[in-house]
Amino acid sequence: DPLLEYSXEAMEISYTAPNSSTYEPPQIRNNQLIDTILNELLNVQTNYTMGLVNLLQNFIIPLRIQVLSTGIGSDMTRINQVFPPTIDEITRINCILHDSLNKVSRYGYVEIIRVVGMILPYFYKAFIRHEANLKLYTTRLNKFYSKNSKTIFSNNLINKGNYSTREIDSIVSGSLLELPKFKLILKRLHDAIESEKLKKKNFENFVDNETSIITYYYNTAIEVIDAFGGCQGSEDRKIDSQLRVFTPTGKILTELATKWPPELQYGWLSRKVVGIYELRNVKPKSFFDLEILIIFSDHLLFLTIIEESYYIRKKNEPIKSLSVSDILMHSLVNEKPLPVLSLLPSMEVNSWCNLNEVITSCYLGVSSHTSSKQDFLRFLNVSKSGFKSXXLDHLIFTKNYEILRSKENKYLSGHKIIELINKAKVLYKNQLFHLFRSTDSKITYLLNCS
């Protein structure tokens, strides 16, 4: 299970505090309300960070060490199901933000908002993975406690912090409330700053030279939080009720893209989402070359991003922005409504096929965009009709894609995607089969179904 593997997101940016020659102090100083809100923001973030750090140091890590010393791999798997590595992921990114906020706290509200806007996008992937692990978490934790009360929870060498199940649940599950709390505090901070500036403009010659910076990083932070919480805005696209496609949870899938294939309107009682990736089409039919690959347990679906502003924004973005694939993964896996649709570019279904009709291979090539070597994927459709498409003018049997080397998936390999496609094929089976793994590490899996 990919959710039970530690998969921290690489960060290519880090906050650098201003030096004395370039630093410009905030235009509003010694304001009690603003200072109080800033202190609240720092205290809330510190409390969440220290709660997670202490739980890891005083319970989870000693427990893992104890289990690893026994040499029984199945025991570690069971431990990871109750204390998943996503706890480590959200602790890591909280520590990074905590360290940056400590460095910047003396510089005032402009730099604090800048830090939050720069680092909060890296919270998104860690938190959606963590939320996916928390389904029925309290039940799993209580069951684990009932079986290991004396050997683990009453063992002072393991439970150094003397944690109860209620405290553990509060820290692990309660961590998801951090982002909504951030939003409330950031909104109060932003409103307080704007209110004080308005007063200055009314009673003195006041030239505002920091609003553009504050607004940019504030909006970036709020967009991340809204995307995580599934905040619905007033920009929802109006969809013909006859064209809507619903999953069992009531999700309207035609919000994702236009030209949704009719054959995917059915089968949602057993269909699962295995993975979602953003790729670049090697031979696009138009300027729009970025596509979203959705790996279902029974189909592969390719969505083309057809919004020109998205390509411009992607090229010129100064800091990390939310990945379309991550937003969709959060919505489909964690059963959350789609966020404000301005976060999602316009998309349309390019093509689709049955999962068992495709052979996927990986090869190394040179990117025409970066001039560097990276992985490419080749999808070969072995059916007589090839890939299906809403605007099919000729048969297509092969599709080639470049795996984007970006801040979001710099270390993603083609073999990882192939492995997930093979796992999806296993999920799709409804009869007995044999599973073989090659001794050659270059070959991921071989399937022989009976």
Curated annotation (Swiss-Prot):
Q: Does the keyword Cell cycle apply?
A: yes
Q: Per the record's keyword annotation, is Cell cycle included, yes or no?
A: yes
**Which keywords does the record carry?**
Cell cycle
Which InterPro entries does UniProt cross-reference here?
A: DBL_dom_sf, DH_dom
Pfam families in the record, alphabetically? PH_BUD3_C
Q: Which cysteines are joined by disulfide bonds?
A: none
Gene Ontology MF terms in the entry:
guanyl-nucleotide exchange factor activity
Q: Which family does it belong to?
A: Belongs to the BUD3 family.
Instruction: Write out the function statement from the record.
Output: Co-assembles with BUD4 at bud sites. BUD4 and BUD3 may cooperate to recognize a spatial landmark (the neck filaments) during mitosis and they subsequently become a landmark for establishing the axial budding pattern in G1.
Name assigned to this protein:
Bud site selection protein 3
**Organism of this sequence:** Schwanniomyces occidentalis (Yeast)
- Lineage summary: Eukaryota, Fungi, Dikarya, Ascomycota, Saccharomycotina
Identify the gene encoding this protein.
BUD3
